[in-house]
A protein has these predicted regions:
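Glycine- and charged-residue-rich phosphate/anionic-cofactor binding loop of Rossmann-like
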Residues: 80-82, 350-363
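N-terminal Rossmann-like dinucleotide-binding module
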Residues: 2-5, 45-98
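Contiguous beta-strand/loop segments that form the cofactor/metal-binding neighborhood of enzyme cores
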Residues: 235-320, 327-354, 368-372, 385-436, ...
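Conserved acidic residues
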Residues: 83, 101, 117
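Long, intrinsically disordered low-complexity tandem-repeat segments
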Residues: 6-47
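Predominantly a Rossmann-like dinucleotide-binding segment in NAD(P)-dependent oxidoreductases
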Residues: 176-259, 267
């Protein structure tokens, strides 16, 4: 089986840090940097070090470069060994930074020839399911990039297949490895912000027009009749959706009872670049996430937990938390993060629980499915966006404030008076409700609008 070449991202993430950092305020847990299989506190050499697990990386360009650097970091720590790279066009020595390991465009054959125990799959969205099942058929464990699939049916085919094969599968929502996630859940459970009333998420990013031309599937909802479902909420800012659902305690498919979407675009693409979604959960608390790739200025995305007597803001790329509650001054906390590949190795060696199983992304995949089934994103009026001179990008004036307001008030764009959206109560362009359930706005009161803490 061959794999399509990995897709370059417009702005790849920096290489992983060489060693985990100290984490004041982090929740108790595994010691950062500990070697899976080693006995904590044992004298050097007292416990035999496990053999490094052979890893094959499918997709080593674009965002795959981050995974390549991470695998090499863990290789230096003796946890894994990079056994092979699957690319249609092999990496050169200059790209790899030396002599690369075995390379092949045939993913299945490469898994077999290298004896891989783990496959890291970072390929175009619509190839994920087939590659995951190819690994599962060979008993190879998986770290599968997000989004795990372009539709709920493909997700179920993947999840059921890996479960039947008995392999471990981790979905690559790196933010869910943050120690801030369980810490925030504990604060909410302890009543730190009163009764939780809803979760907001905000992502205001900028992307040049070339971003949507970086690969044949970029900016597409379908390619050659196959679902792709690229888009602001399903791909670049998917972490905001998944993290908001995780903090709401609504991660499984059955936790979702209704979804409203508003999908728009300033670019000449099929997919959305400015969108929002409101999820009604079985708990009755709304989860609203707004995103744009046409911001006036780039900002760090965040998730906001609303309560009757306070709020908690989580900048998930920074592992930074701000707690604001009645009767207390603001408290800022910084947390560590467990790398998801390292957690997968730990699971295989010591039996440690996986952090992001396929079932724990079922609610996210319900959002992807709602976006897939929604009307195609509506083009914004020409007067609603402008080009930035010398920057080759499009901006929607005022969208930064709308994204923040959506997270603050749990509202959709059409309810916030956006000049390019219809008033609340009318069918906004590109909008859809995927359930007959009452809307989240009807089922839970909005907290008063507050100043954004971005």
């Amino acid at each position: 089986m061959t794999t399509p070449e990995a897709t370059p991202e417009a702005a790849p993430e920096p290489a992983p840090e060489p060693a985990p950092r100290a984490t004041p305020g982090a929740t108790p847990g595994a010691t950062p940097g500990a070697t899976p299989g080693a006995t904590p506190g044992a004298a050097s050499g007292a416990t035999p070090r496990p053999e490094p697990l052979p890893v094959v990386l499918a997709g080593a360009r674009g965002h795959g470069r981050w995974h390549l650097a991470n695998i090499r970091r863990l290789q230096e720590d003796g946890l894994v060994r990079l056994a092979g790279i699957c690319e249609l066009t092999p990496l050169t020595e200059d790209e790899y930074g030396g002599e690369p390991p075995e390379q092949s465009a045939d993913f299945g054959a490469l898994l077999e020839s290298t004896g891989a125990r783990i496959a890291v799959v970072c390929t175009p969205i619509h190839t994920h399911t087939d590659l995951a099942l190819a690994a599962a058929e060979r008993g190879v464990h998986l770290l599968l990039e997000k989004p795990p699939a372009p539709s709920y049916a493909e997700f179920r085919r993947m999840a059921d297949g890996v479960a039947a094969a008995g392999i471990a599968c981790q979905i690559g929502f790196q933010s869910l490895g943050s120690h801030a996630v369980p810490a925030i859940r504990a604060l909410v459970a302890d009543g730190a912000i009163g009764r939780p009333t809803g979760i907001g998420g905000a992502g205001a990013w900028v992307r040049p027009e070339d971003y949507f031309r970086r690969a044949p599937w970029a900016g597409r909802r379908r390619l050659n009749g196959v679902d792709v479902i690229d888009g602001a909420l399903t791909n670049p800012l998917a972490h905001a959706v998944a993290t908001a659902l995780a903090l709401a305690g609504s991660t499984r498919a059955e936790d979702v009872t209704g979804i409203e979407t508003e999908l728009l675009r300033a670019h000449d693409i099929e997919s959305d670049d400015t969108s929002c979604v409101r999820v009604t959960t079985a708990q009755g608390r709304p989860v609203t996430v707004a995103a744009t790739l046409c911001a006036e200025r780039a900002d760090d995305p965040y998730v906001l937990v609303h309560g009757t007597s306070g709020r908690i803001t989580f900048w998930y790329k920074q592992d930074r938390v701000l707690v604001q509650r009645a009767g207390h001054g603001p408290e800022e906390l910084h947390f560590g993060r467990t790398d998801l590949l390292e957690n997968l190795v730990d699971h295989l060696v010591t039996g440690a629980p996986l952090l992001v199983t396929p079932d724990a992304t079922g609610a996210f995949m319900k959002v992807v499915e709602a976006i897939r089934r929604a009307p195609d994103p509506a083009p914004l009026p020409a007067a609603a966006w402008r080009r930035v001179p010398g920057e080759n990008r499009r901006v929607v004036p005022g969208v930064d404030g709308l994204v923040a307001a959506a997270a603050d008030t749990l509202s959709l764009y059409s309810e916030l008076g956006a000049s390019w959206a219809l008033p609340a109560g009318q069918a906004a362009p590109g909008s859809a409700r995927q359930s007959g359930e009452p809307s989240a706005q009807q089922s839970a009161p909005h907290p008063p609008k507050e100043v954004s803490t971005r």
